[in-house]
From Swiss-Prot:
It comes from Canis lupus familiaris (Dog). Belongs to the intercrine beta (chemokine CC) family. The gene is CCL3. Gene3D superfamilies: 2.40.50.40. One of its GO terms (cellular component) is cytoplasm. This is C-C motif chemokine 3. Disulfide bonds join 33-57, 34-73. PANTHER family: C-C MOTIF CHEMOKINE 3, SMALL INDUCIBLE CYTOKINE A. Residues 1-19 form the signal peptide.
Amino acid sequence: MKVPGAALAVLLCTMSLCSQVFSPFGADTPIACCFSYVSKQIPRKFIVDCFETSSQCSKPGIIFETRKGRQACANPSEAWVQEYVADLKLKA
């Protein structure tokens, strides 16, 4: 007995949607996590924005975005990182 292609496609789509809905993280899966930090301080003039990584990430981190749109992970416990974050919050 052959299963029509359309029925098989519907079944596969349904299964993929269910796996998203019943996933332990669901739609709240973090977008960006830090697995390592930059080893040197990034010059402040290159930084335009920052955000904190999700609490679901294995390592805490601050992700800085540069003028060229690049992202770099920094250790939130370092003094220069805290200064940059405070400065960016004041300018927001």
